Amino acid sequence: MSDDQSLSEVEMSPVGSEDPSLTPDPLPPHAHSSPDDDDDDDEEEEEETKVKKEQDSEDERFPVCIREAVSQVLNGYDWTLVPMPVRVNGGSKSKPHVKRPMNAFMVWAQAARRKLADQYPHLHNAELSKTLGKLWRLLNENDKRPFIEEAERLRMQHKKDHPDYKYQPRRRKNGKPSPGEGDGSSEAEGGAASIQAHYKNSHLDHRHGSPMSDGNSEHSTGQSHGPPTPPTTPKTELQAGKSDGKRDGSHALREGGKPQIDFGNVDIGEISHDVMSNMETFDVNEFDQYLPPNGHAGHPSHIGGYTSSYGLTGALAAGPSAWALAKQHSQTVADSKAQVKTESSSTSHYTEQPSTSQLTYTSLGLPHYGSAFPSISRPQFDYADHQPSSSYYSHSAQASSLYSAFSYMGPPQRPLYTAISDPPSVAQSHSPTHWEQPVYTTLSRP
């Protein structure tokens, strides 16, 4: 084992053997690199000679007079004033292209470029072109004459070399627009977006303003169904649009008959005491247009008037509707009592039922909204059984106690005037055939 180990050590160690055949001779430090260095030197010399030959050939391309003229012009300009950014490498042209013959300026520019490329290799092409253009404009006719003559010679030579030559400019790629076009397009897009946003806002105002708009406008716009307390939105025009829309929609409701508002989303219980205490913002005279026209209360031909008036007050989202209902109820009571006093001949006709029995509204047929609520029995609507007519006068002057004025409409008894289950069994109420001027003394504004 010891002999094997010694043999292996001798084999592994580079200097352990004395046999010159096993160990290579130590080489001088320049032995491996000398051939490569010689090759590199030869290649550099060849490249230098090639560059010199190319420069000589390029110099031979221009006559001596052109080179002298270029030197004469360039010697008078300090090229150290031109900024020298990093040169950008241009893309190589894959397809050969026959160039146009150079004009006088191109002859001057190319000859000057070749001379300046050796002296100032870091000049940027754009800055060089601008400077050459400035110098060309400063030259007089005598300085330009050699370049003009050379350009004419090149044109004749080009005509001989390419007799069928036709100038075909390359088409500009439409992928990238110019900076000016990009700015214009962005401005146009911004203007269109602002116009669209303005139209969208106005469209929302229109949909909110008119009750005769789409039935799903309240759902689609995402507005709450609470009372229209200002300021619910930052825009004050929206409130004006709402009031105008209601005013316009009242005529359409009277003429059309069936309103487009879903009463399932309207609840009088949503009225707060703050809204009741701020009722001075609503004009009392504004709600006179919602009162039904002259006619018999129980007559079927005038049911549409009551239906449209109640549909519109329901569309007012609880706040104004409570005010209009209180005003209407009190005025109807006052009118009926006035008729009782004036028409003494028909006293027995009015004593058959209480003076407030005309508030039963038994013939109010709302089949469109009847499915939203269960059928209501008659006693919930018979106001004469629950409350005397004097409650309208005792609570009409108190804005904060309008809930007590509507004590017949407690939270569990808010049917929103749906169809009554037994309309045939209830006697139709009687009201005067002609409406008199409303009495405003019975309901004072808070």
Curated annotation (Swiss-Prot):
Composition bias, Basic and acidic residues: 153-167, 243-257
Tissue occurrence: First expressed at stages 13/14 at the lateral edges of the neural plate, in the neural crest forming region. By stage 22, neural crest cells migrate in the cranial region and strong expression is seen in the crest cells that populate the branchial arches as well as those migrating in the frontonasal region. Also strongly expressed in the trunk neural crest. Expression in the otic vesicle begins around stage 25 and persists until at least stage 40.
Pfam families in the cross-refs: HMG_box, Sox_N
The record's account of how the chain is modified after translation: Sumoylated.
Induction description: By sox8, sox9 and snai1/snail, wnt-signaling and fgf-signaling in the neural crest-forming region.
Gene3D superfamilies: High mobility group box domain
Chain residues forming the annotated DNA-binding region: 98-166
Gene Ontology molecular-function annotations: DNA binding; DNA-binding transcription factor activity; DNA-binding transcription factor activity, RNA polymerase II-specific; enzyme binding; RNA polymerase II cis-regulatory region sequence-specific DNA binding
Region of interest (Transactivation domain (TAC)), residue spans: 337-446
Alphabetical UniProt keywords: Cytoplasm, Developmental protein, DNA-binding, Isopeptide bond, Nucleus, Transcription, Transcription regulation, Ubl conjugation, Wnt signaling pathway
Name of the protein described by the UniProt record: Transcription factor Sox-10
Organism: Xenopus laevis
Taxonomic placement: Eukaryota, Metazoa, Chordata, Craniata, Vertebrata
